[in-house]
């Protein structure tokens, strides 16, 4: 199996003169059945890169949709780096080789490709990759830095079809997520010249020991603000952060393999993916 990747090495720079949002045009118009999306948040610690990886693998290997991941979270490039680590483990691990062989025989899906780039070049490099490799993804997932002042982040948001904002029951994270969503809604979603159509919030890292009434209270506040909230709530699970290990102890978050069936059900990643697909169909 060949791994497609395209690298752009130029580092990002802080924005000194942000682009005028009113002049952003929909130069990358959506084609039928093809969406640009991003799991994004201003605050760290909500697992946006981990969620991007889990969703990419679930959609690609289980739902059999063609997925492209654009890793522009400079300088970490955590998804690209994870793919590199996993390929190194694969070289010396017959168990994972067997799992991949079985997965390919069932799904017919090769590895989803990852493009490593920077936010200011993200969409252009994704389009170049698709053209050069003749790869037509149905879903392109962009993993962007959490800092909106990073050059190209706002412009890339404007070229998405939909943004999904994870949040957890932490006052600082919630306030940041709600403020972030409201600003993007006013400046991007409500601008008819811009491609971005919707922003959806969803709960992650839900502690099952917390009272359901607490989240219901938060849900009411969010809806009063006029922000769309997804039904799926993701519980906290340590396997969200567990990559492939050389000892072969289970599959949680992997770029090479679909998450295990038990983990998929327990983590509700499958529920989240299918709810996202349903929402995308309404755009």
What are these regions (language model features)?
Residues 1-42:
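Extreme N-terminal, non-catalytic leader segments
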Residues 27-65:
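Walker A (P-loop) phosphate-binding motif
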Residues 40-46, 60-140:
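P-loop/Walker-type NTP enzyme "switch/lid" segment
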Residues 177-193:
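Conserved C-terminal guanine-recognition region of P-loop GTPase G domains, centered on the G4
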Residues 205-254:
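Beta-strand-loop-alpha "switch" segments that mediate conformational coupling across diverse proteins
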Residues 241-273, 277:
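Inter-lobe coupling/hinge region of RecA-like P-loop helicase motors
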């Amino acid at each position: 199996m060949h791994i497609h990747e395209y690298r752009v090495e130029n580092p990002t720079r802080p924005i000194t003169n942000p682009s005028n949002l009113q002049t952003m045009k929909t130069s990358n118009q959506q084609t039928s059945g093809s969406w640009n999306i991003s799991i994004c948040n201003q605050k760290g610690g909500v697992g946006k890169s981990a969620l991007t990886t889990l969703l990419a693998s679930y959609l690609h290997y289980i739902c059999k949709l063609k997925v492209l991941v654009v890793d522009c979270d400079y300088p970490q490039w955590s998804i690209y780096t994870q793919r590199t680590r996993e390929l190194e483990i694969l070289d010396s691990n017959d168990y994972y080789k067997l799992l991949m062989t079985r997965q390919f025989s069932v799904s017919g899906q090769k590895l989803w490709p990852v493009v490593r780039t920077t936010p200011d070049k993200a969409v252009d490099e994704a389009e170049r990759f698709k053209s050069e490799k003749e790869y037509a993804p149905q879903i392109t997932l962009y993993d962007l830095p959490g800092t909106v002042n990073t050059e190209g982040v706002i412009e890339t948001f404007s070229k998405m079809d939909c943004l999904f904002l994870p949040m957890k029951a932490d006052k600082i994270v919630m306030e940041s997520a709600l403020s972030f969503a409201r600003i993007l809604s006013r400046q991007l979603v409500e601008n008819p010249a811009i491609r971005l159509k919707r922003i959806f919030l969803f709960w992650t890292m839900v502690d099952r020991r917390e009272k359901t009434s607490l989240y219901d209270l938060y849900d009411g506040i969010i809806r009063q603000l006029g922000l769309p909230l997804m039904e799926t709530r993701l519980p906290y699970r340590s396997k969200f952060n567990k990559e492939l290990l050389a000892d072969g102890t289970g599959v949680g978050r992997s770029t090479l393999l679909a998450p295990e069936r038990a983990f998929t059900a327990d983590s509700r990643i499958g529920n989240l993916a299918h709810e996202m697909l349903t929402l995308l169909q309404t755009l």
